[in-house]
Design a protein with these regions (language model features):
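Extended, charged catalytic domains and RNA/DNA-binding interfaces, predominantly
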Residues: 1-236
Length: 238
């Protein structure tokens, strides 16, 4: 959580940065790059780490407190940070899935945005984090030398027995981008992600969803059925 989009681009162009455990430098600078941070609860970890923030004062935010302090950015604390990361991207349990107040739930209903119902969520911080990703891409884009993209990762993990992690890196074609990214809080159905992308395309904003880490998909890359369990063979026959 301590590496910013700005730092990521400097790393891609050959600078040395720290990942909290050791220094890292690429063998060769890259020609193009995109920051594909996880859209689900984007920007929230820094608030959870701050015990003075509104969401950081929640009792279940305590494991995240002071997450980015220097003494917590060591090899000894790496495993604990990994567990907290899994808590963020998981589809059940933990602070990220803690239900908010009845007012939060009502707001989520009328906004048709269920992330508002989470006690762990701050909408303005979420939009701010997304804006910083876009600003960093714009700042570091150098046509003909180093190409950047507005992008993010749609992150979803299935429940048991599959326990599959099968994500998509969503890359936007132009310097424009939607107000906020579509995350698994909106839907864990990839077909609805594609429908959202089609809607953006109709408005002139093209994008591409690239399957990410299919090795952890437990066979979901080559499913014979749609998300609603209708077989592709049946669809082709009708």
């Amino acid at each position: 959580t301590n590496v910013t989009p700005e730092m990521s681009y400097r790393f891609a162009k050959g600078e040395t940065i720290s990942n909290g455990v050791r220094d890292m430098t690429l063998a060769e600078p890259l020609d193009f790059y995109a920051v594909t941070d996880h859209a689900i609860l984007l920007g929230m970890a820094n608030l959870w780490a701050d015990p003075t923030s509104d969401v950081g004062r929640h009792p279940k935010a305590k494991p995240y407190h002071n997450l980015n302090r220097p003494e917590n950015l060591s090899s000894e604390s790496a495993f604990n940070r990994f567990l907290l990361f899994n808590d963020i991207r998981g589809d059940s349990g933990g602070f990220p899935r803690e239900r908010g107040s009845i007012l939060d739930i009502i707001r989520a209903f009328f906004a048709q945005n269920f992330i508002f119902a989470s006690a762990a969520y701050d909408h303005e911080e979420h939009l701010s984090a997304w804006k910083k990703i876009m600003e960093a891409a714009e700042e570091h884009n150098d046509p003909g030398k180093f190409t950047t993209f507005n992008a993010y990762e749609w992150t979803v993990r299935n429940q048991e027995p599959e326990s599959a992690s099968y994500h998509r890196n969503v890359i936007f074609k132009s310097s424009k981008a939607p107000k906020r990214p579509f995350s698994s809080f909106d839907s864990n159905n990839p077909e609805e992600l594609w429908n959202w992308m089609d809607g953006l395309r109709s408005d002139g904003l093209d994008s591409l969803a690239i399957p990410h880490n299919p090795n952890g998909s437990n066979g979901q890359v080559f499913k014979k059925y749609k998300f609603d369990a209708v077989s592709y063979t049946h669809l082709r026959a009708h």
